[in-house]
Amino acid sequence: MRLNLPISPLLPFPSYLHSFKPGFSLQRASQMILSAFEVDFVFTAAYSLATTFKQPSSHLMIIRPSQHWFRRLFVWHGSVLSKIMFRLSLNVLMSVIAVLSYQWYESLGVHLTLAPFSLLGVAIAIFLGFRNNASYARFIEARTLWGSLLITQRSLLRQIKSTLLSDDAAVREISALMMAFNWSLKHQLRQTDGRADLLRLLPPRWHDQVMNDPSPCNQLLLCMGFWLGEQRQRGVISDIVWQSIDANINHLSQVLGGCERIVTTPIPFAYSLILHRTVYLFCTLLPFALVADLHYMTPLVSVFVSYTFLSLESLAEELEDPFGMAANDLPLDALCVIIERNLKALQGDYPLPEPLKPDNHYNLT
């Protein structure tokens, strides 16, 4: 596949660089590079980035106001550039080595052309596109599950509060169990200690049962079931209402299972490994193919091409685990506070906890 893109006129190349090859010009070099890599760049950008960011999501860990396009070019926080800076430095080093050793290995009859890199670049672009799409699908599924958690708990509390009109204590108890479930799920997904949040939220009679269980989320669902059974035995909830409330509790269990599935089922390692190796081999050898035509421009062009591939590969790796603490993962703390505010507002429990706000670097945990 070839894309006919216009080549704008360029200034002539500095005269001192013409000593490498007679008749060499920057316009000729730009035409050669665009011809070799237009498929790589266009396919990677159009497929990987478009599929990666086609659906907007709220409450990302990087929350930025609208910025001018020029200022966005220099954004550091939230970019994967900080993660790949060392790797790009190695690419610049390989480019310098390629420039310095060009005449030596050229005299040995070693000729590395751009043709194999053009073919390999297409393959890498396809794999990166599917890799980023798979990672973003996991991110979207995780965000959908937490959105479903908020909707289900609001519906659940509304059903209970409208049924138990004169029993505020029972309503507060089930609300506390739901809020404890959210924070416990957050700690389970991030593998952190949730004892402080459980002690803050749990009703006293459920402390020992939940705190001593290796899976607090499962135990909290069981406590909700016990609570619902108690209300049914008291005769304050009819069978029809009981079935409706139990269905919402079952949906909370489905949310838990969906989050556990994402955490325990990563993208197959062999798939990630072959892409990782291919990208790094491509970026390592690329300067030796560019130097014959670009010479001193080799480091600049090589690091730009490498940035495109390495950043997409790094972003896919980051989005693969949407519950982590990376810059572009889900802000589970903020989501838990949002749900807690909603539940407390429904039962009239004021003042509400303050919503979390991004820090000076626009990070929202």
Indicate where each model-derived feature is located.
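Short, C-terminally biased terminal segments at protein or domain edges
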Residues: 1-49
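N-terminal juxtamembrane/topogenic regions of multi-pass membrane proteins
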Residues: 53-147, 166, 294-296, 341, ...
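Alpha-helical transmembrane anchor segments
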Residues: 95-96, 100-106, 115-117, 127-131, ...
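Short helix-terminus and kink motifs of transmembrane alpha helices
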Residues: 130-138, 143, 147, 218, ...
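Intracellular alpha-helical coupling/juxtamembrane segments of multi-pass membrane proteins
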Residues: 139-156, 248-256, 262, 326-329, ...
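Solvent-exposed, non-transmembrane helices and loops of integral membrane proteins
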Residues: 153-182, 188, 323-365
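Structured inter-helical modules in multipass membrane proteins
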Residues: 159-269
